[in-house]
Amino acid sequence: MPTGARAALVIALIYLFLVGVSSLEAGIKIMGADTQERLFSAVSNPIAGLCVGILGTVLVQSSSASTSVIVGLVASGALGVEQAVPMVMGANIGTTVTNTLVSLGHVRQSAEFKRAFAAATVHDFFNVLAVSILLPIELIFKPISGIAKWISELLVGSGGTEWKSPVKKWVKEPVGWLKDLWDQFGASGNVKGALMVATGLVIVLIALALVTKNMKALVAARIERSLNAILGKAGGLVALLVGIIVTIAVQSSSITTSILIPLSAAGVLTLRNAYPVTLGANVGTTITALLAALAASSPDSLTVALAHTTFNVIGILSLYALPFFREVPVIAATAMAEIAVRRRVLAVCYVFGMFIVAPLIGVAILR
């Protein structure tokens, strides 16, 4: 496909994504407060919310998709900002499963697998460390949601000002068509709301998958050729910026971090060069939720999207910028890779335990 045509397709897919977010919001509003309360009763506990964020992201293999859904839920009033913030933190952890799974593809070659698994799990350990430190602070003092709310009010006006979405009118008509479609099938009330939610979710997932695929075709091949040359000469700050820019370009932190795995496995990219790129990917991936917030009708949805960005920026400033904390994920990932090389089955157990079993237990106990 010609480059110009593919770029136009990406723009159309982003529009489709916004339609999906608005459909999700409209469906939840139709379902009503009682249904919403039952639907989200399992996430009233912040730790349960964290676990739901992990599981939801693992399920759809995209933190962009899961945080966009969370933004839609907040916009509809089904979820409060306090409930949503732990969820987006969980999404940060859940998204790292992709590059960890990619690293398992090198399992037959010990030296390659050791380097690949370390490069993958350094992202896991940083995100877990960030959540372990910042979630308790957020629950007590609320600095993340406070900063996000302050920025949100600067952008849309002080409290009490009606939030007028700049893209709402662009997606209003297609959402109306979806409502009319389900009306023709005789759906009403909660059934219609559930169908709108399901339709919106399908649209969001399909649109994001196609955006990712086409953006990768546009830019990722060039990125893979030049990334190591850039990072080999640059310090952590430039690597961080590369992670942000690449992730915004391809609309997927998983692609950015997964590109690093074969480079690390081959020994052409060091763990310390790969590490800051993954942190930049954390920040870059939040652009999707910010975009979703533009299609929502509530200032709280923008607050949650900004909270995701704020959390990642604070995590980098407070952990990566400090030499002691910066080394913790590197040391942990290196040690985990040593263990995984000696007992490869433990690598598989780690993936299931970290991303599925532990979150499921958390939800089951704390709901």
Regions found by a protein language model. Name each.
Residues 3-13, 86, 118, 194-201, ...:
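Alpha-helical transmembrane segments of integral membrane proteins
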Residues 13, 17, 21, 45, ...:
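Alpha-helical transmembrane segments in multi-pass membrane proteins
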Residues 18, 101-169, 202-209, 213-214, ...:
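Juxtamembrane and boundary regions of transmembrane helices in multi-pass small-molecule transporters
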Residues 53, 57-60, 68, 168-193, ...:
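Long, highly hydrophobic alpha-helical transmembrane signal-anchor segments
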Residues 57-92, 104-107, 153-164, 246-313:
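Membrane-interfacial helix-loop connectors
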